[in-house]
From Swiss-Prot:
Its biological purpose: Catalyzes the reversible phosphorylation of UMP to UDP.
Binding site for UMP: G44, D66, I114, T115, P116, G117, Q118, T119, T120
PANTHER family: URIDYLATE KINASE (PTHR42833), URIDYLATE KINASE PUMPKIN, CHLOROPLASTIC (PTHR42833:SF4)
Gene responsible for this protein: pyrH
EC numbers: 2.7.4.22
Membrane spanning stretches: none
Superkingdom of source: Archaea
A Gene Ontology BP annotation from the UniProt entry: 'de novo' CTP biosynthetic process
Pfam annotation, one family: AA_kinase
UniProt: ATP binding residues: G10, S11, G45, R49, T140, Y146, D149
Protein name: Uridylate kinase
Source species of the chain: Methanospirillum hungatei JF-1 (strain ATCC 27890 / DSM 864 / NBRC 100397 / JF-1)
Pathway noted in the entry: Pyrimidine metabolism; CTP biosynthesis via de novo pathway; UDP from UMP (UMPK route): step 1/1
Keyword Cytoplasm: yes
Membership in a protein family: Belongs to the UMP kinase family.
Length: 236
């Protein structure tokens, strides 16, 4: 059975508390888990950023702000576990080792942040390595990796394929510009480079696209691999 690790942005799952995107994900993740060993790492999204910003206004240190962010990711993850019901392992796991043990139940394993200073993308990248994942999918608010921020630069071009070293160059270049949000952080990219597990960065706002990609192997996004080979269809 193939192993899939998803990094699901908090802003994708909960763009707003009054406009949740959880319900469409329930049936999709449940169907995916019937054919795959599935791990989902949930981010904090805008809510985490708001809490962190407020903490900083009180001159809280960065470690404290990180802990606040982790709490929000786990709150989002807990909400997803509750929504998935019997399809999910009943607790939000708090370590990679616990995730491996929870997977023995055959349920969807959900986690949030675990370490101050580390994004949930990095958590998911390490989890992909620990589980020997067949594919690591980063579900974001953009449809792939671009040469520049497509929301600010109309000339930005999307990469269809690239290797981890090329992705690292793009991320480093974009992070050097103040105020620019990159699709993935440097630590996560370095983990992908180290473990060599294929990474797909794609738009997560419509979960049907995720299911279609896994079923057909066709996708709109950026595939990052060492050898340029398409990992789809995943080996059964």
């Amino acid at each position: 059975m193939p192993t899939i690790v998803l990094s699901l942005g908090g802003s994708i799952l909960l763009p707003d508390i009054d406009r949740p995107n959880i319900k469409p994900y329930i049936s999709v993740l449940t169907r995916i888990s019937a054919k795959n060993r599935l791990f989902v790492v949930v981010g904090g999204g805008g809510t985490a950023r708001q809490y962190i910003s407020l903490a900083r206004s009180f001159e809280a240190d960065e470690a404290f702000s990180d802990e606040l962010g982790i709490m929000v990711t786990r709150l989002n993850a807990t909400l997803l576990v509750g929504a998935l019901g019997q399809a999910a392992y009943p607790c939000v796991v708090t370590s990679h080792t616990e995730a491996l043990c929870a997977a023995e139940t055959g349920k969807i394993v959900v986690m949030g942040g675990i370490t101050p200073g580390q994004t949930t993308d990095a958590v998911a990248a390490v989890l992909a390595e620990r589980t020997g994942a067949d594919i690591f999918i980063n579900l974001t608010a953009v449809d792939g990796i671009y040469s520049a921020d497509p929301r600010k630069d109309p000339a930005a071009k999307r990469f269809e394929t690239m290797n981890p070293a090329e992705l690292l160059d793009v991320v480093i270049g974009q992070q050097a510009v103040a105020g620019v949000n990159t699709v993935m952080d440097i630590v996560a990219v370095k983990m992908v480079e180290r473990c060599g597990i294929p990474l797909l960065v794609m738009d997560g706002r419509d979960p049907a696209l995720l299911e279609s990609t896994l079923e057909t192997g066709r996708f709109v996004g950026t595939l990052v691999t060492r050898n340029g080979k398409n990992p789809f269809p995943l080996k059964k």
